[in-house]
Amino acid sequence: MENFMRIDSKESYENAVATLNAWAKAYYDDDAPIASDEEYDALYHEVLAYEQVNPAQKSLFSPTTRIGGGVSEGFSKARHIKQMWSMEDIFSQLELVAWLKRGEKQNLSFVAEPKFDGASLNLLYEKGMLVRAITRGDGITGEEVTQNARVIKSIPLNISYDGRIEIRGEVVIKKADFDAINEERTRNGETLLSNPRNAAAGSLRQLDSAVTAKRKLLFIPWGVGEQNLGLAKHSEVMKFVRDLGFYRDDFFKILDADGLAGAYNELLKQRDEKDVMMDGMVIRVDDLARCEELGYTVKFPKFMVAFKFPAIEKTTRLLDVALQVGRSGVVTPVGVLDEVVIDGARVKSATLHNFDEIERLGVMKNDLISIIRSGDVIPKITSVFKERRDGTQTPIIRPKFCPECGSHLLDEGVFIKCQNLNCRARVINSIIHYASKKCLNIDGLGEAIINLLYEKGLISRVIDIYSLKFEDLMALEGFKDKKAQNLLDAIEASKGASLARFITGLGCEHIGEVAAKKIAQNFGEGWLEADFDEVKNLEGFGEEMANSLMDFIEVNKDEILALQSIVRPSFERKQITQNAFSGKSVVITGTLSRPRDEIKAELEGYGAKVVGSVSKKTDFVLAGSNAGSKLQKAVELGVRVIDEGEFERLKLEI
């Protein structure tokens, strides 16, 4: 992250306060951030540190004295009965220890639960009925969005409690639902939503509640405001709230101070698997009387804190755009970044997908941008901070010539393609794909070796790897007897690979591992003779996939037959006896004793369809430890849940 502001004087302090207020307005009020969370947090803490050293200079407008944002003119104002406080953020174990020492909290009992990344909402119930819903706003006053709250299915319109109670929580969008929304917006030619948090906030504040209803928002309760329950502990209050019919997350722990670090690390490991975006863990003193004793600062409760996760979204600068040519000839733009570290990984590049995406983002070279990285997925650009341009930016031009071979490119709109079948990049990437683990799995034949073999004129197409000789390899730099023989042995071992792997390795557009497996299972050695209708009618296929395969076979049939005669791929038509899993839909979740891919392959061998999400159509959920929300949904829907022990018992019946 660039160091955009150094606070070493009253003037630089006031500039920093103004910058933070502008960023906060964009984030809270406009739902259009112009800085990343990490960038805001870093500058916020610099301002706070300056104020602690120079209290007399503290501005009345400093964000360290305020909570959240203001109120949009599109909604009427409404006051919370009890103030909705923000939480203090901490970012390390040392800060956690310091927080525990303040107020002598070391020997207390705590509740630990996820900090979901969404939009806070306060629900007021009177005599069992939902009467008002208010956004956080500035903590005192928010926007009344009652009509929109009523169309969120996870918010009960009535509850079995007659008293007056404010139930607070986070409005979020599940990752899968967010992706589905953007897919639909892409089809409709609409601007894509930048991330689930902004999507949730924007959806909650729609003037048309019909739009809110379509967004599949989820309300996750995390506390109460006004209440007369007479309960002694926060954990008891939350059990009461969830028993009223509100969403119940599976991570909710009551523990002492010694267990907090372990709980944080456990939750951090679930970050990518969770259905909903999390950005930390909330730690709260469980004893409500002790909470009252600890009290509040001007902004934060002293009895709770947000232990933030390492940022997966950061601000950096787009230095350039590199062009990559794939095996199908598609030219893909890749953003070259000023290096940043995200969750321990050094990030120098980000996907830009295609040139239509560049135009949609409106991004230029040397722009400040926000990037997000999740798991091992290639980072992507989520925001462009156009308001912070300084005149050094230059436009990104659609290419007309292949960056590898110089051929004139075919511009089809979304895709720009090199049509030269002998283009170096196309050839090399085709061979890399063929030799990869998910295809023919030729150990030792990686990108560097393939490039070397190509440069020396030893290979120019996939089939050439089967003509390599010992003396060819020994003539190359870095090869000795053992390395050369090992590579030849690995190439020989690829012969007889499964037909599904062979088809995957050919690299036909739209035909991946799953599709190749279905082609092999249904057509066997006659797969090249399958007609359009037969392919189109396979489960999960359609006209686009069938056309792609037919066109690929028509152009490359002679080459495929020659390669197939050397590899002689094996195949086995599916002969599945009736069993507990045949024809069933199965979801795998949690940590299991064997790799998930291994169990998935075994289930598919029994005729099961392994899917990624739980629905009413799911027949089994195979759950390991730390199973998460998929297990919870299975229980709610009445789907049969089995553990590994029951899985093994059911297999014995096959």
Curated annotation (Swiss-Prot):
Enzyme active site: K115
Required cofactor(s): Mg(2+); Mn(2+)
Binding locations of NAD(+): D37, E38, E39, Y40, D41, S86, M87, E113, R136, E170, K308
Binding site for Zn(2+): C402, C405, C418, C423
Example GO biological process: DNA repair
Residue ranges annotated for the BRCT domain, each copy included: 576-654
Catalytic reaction list: NAD(+) + (deoxyribonucleotide)n-3'-hydroxyl + 5'-phospho-(deoxyribonucleotide)m = (deoxyribonucleotide)n+m + AMP + beta-nicotinamide D-nucleotide
A GO term for molecular function: DNA ligase (NAD+) activity
PROSITE patterns noted in UniProt: BRCT (PS50172), DNA_LIGASE_N1 (PS01055)
Keywords: DNA damage, DNA repair, DNA replication, Ligase, Magnesium, Manganese, Metal-binding, NAD, Zinc
Short name of any one Pfam family annotated for the protein: HHH_2
EC number: 6.5.1.2
Family: Belongs to the NAD-dependent DNA ligase family. LigA subfamily.
HAMAP family assigned: DNA_ligase_A (MF_01588)
Its job: DNA ligase that catalyzes the formation of phosphodiester linkages between 5'-phosphoryl and 3'-hydroxyl groups in double-stranded DNA using NAD as a coenzyme and as the energy source for the reaction. It is essential for DNA replication and repair of damaged DNA.
Protein name listed in UniProt: DNA ligase
The species this protein was found in: Campylobacter curvus (strain 525.92)
Gene: ligA
